[in-house]
From Swiss-Prot:
It comes from the Archaea. It is found in: Cytoplasm. This is Imidazole glycerol phosphate synthase subunit HisF. Its main location: cytoplasm.
Length: 249
């Protein structure tokens, strides 16, 4: 059995780490290079950077941050946000990231998944799927959670696997930042539909939430609870081991 992964997520805006609730009301949480290094020391298995500005100025700042962070990390670094073209993918991997996360562009131009996967290997391509419940269905939203695509999330997960994604980063927008727990039903349905790893995201509030979701996902991602020190990664891993979830320590 493969060990489950604990992933620290850093939302980066203009070169700084920020955090909000349901994608809104952003507060400054510090320097990405420092935070990423700290999380690695604490035992995070991977780091995810999501660039939430994706403006031209923001992009330049991001590449600088990616380069500086990748140079100090030995754990995998995934970078997403505003990736629209194969050139974007190439630039981010070229600056030291191990994987890229593609979200809106994957929906609007499916070819990018296959092209990126063929060029850089499926292991480097993560497709991020942001989901809201609409009339009892799980629906894919893009453009930072603002645009209802009308696409069924379970069907989309199956499709991105076929197109060449190596991994799915699954975020519940309903749960994002609430600290009420992950969307277990959503995660379970997606995980049961695909053979590639699923990273659960959105809603971590206490250690039990990680335990619950790691029964149905390959990895659990969190941001706010780590930034605010509500949950310490070494304690979380001990807790999970005691509960019988295999994690790397």
């Amino acid at each position: 059995m493969t060990a489950k992964r604990i992933i620290a997520c850093l939302d980066v805006k203009n070169g700084r780490v920020v955090k909000g609730v349901n994608f809104l009301n952003l507060k400054d949480k510090g320097d990405p290079v420092e935070l990423a290094s700290r999380y690695e020391e604490e035992g995070a298995d991977e780091i995810v950077f999501l660039d939430i500005t994706a403006t031209i100025e923001g992009r330049k700042a991001l590449l600088e941050v990616v380069k500086n962070t990748a140079s100090v990390l030995s754990i995998p670094l995934t970078v997403g946000g505003g990736i629209r073209t194969i050139e974007d993918v190439s630039r981010i991997l070229g600056n030291g990231a191990d994987k890229v996360s593609i979200n809106t562009a994957a929906v609007e131009n499916k070819k990018i998944i296959t092209e990126a996967s063929e060029q850089f290997g499926a292991q480097a391509i993560v497709v991020a799927i942001d989901v809201k419940r609409v009339n009892n269905s799980f629906i894919v939203f893009t453009r930072s959670g603002t645009y209802n695509t009308g696409i069924d999330a379970i069907q989309w997960a199956k499709e991105v696997e076929k197109l060449g994604a190596g991994e799915i980063l699954l975020t519940s927008i309903d749960k994002d930042g609430t600290r009420e727990g992950y969307d277990i039903e959503l995660t379970k349905e997606v995980n049961n539909s695909v053979n590639i790893p699923v990273i659960a995201s959105g809603g971590a509030g206490k250690m039990e939430h990680f335990y619950e979701v790691l029964k149905v996902a390959d990895a659990a991602l969190a941001a706010g609870v780590f930034h605010d020190g509500v949950i310490k990664i070494p304690e979380l891993k001990r807790f999970l081991l005691e509960k019988g979830i295999e994690v790397r320590v």
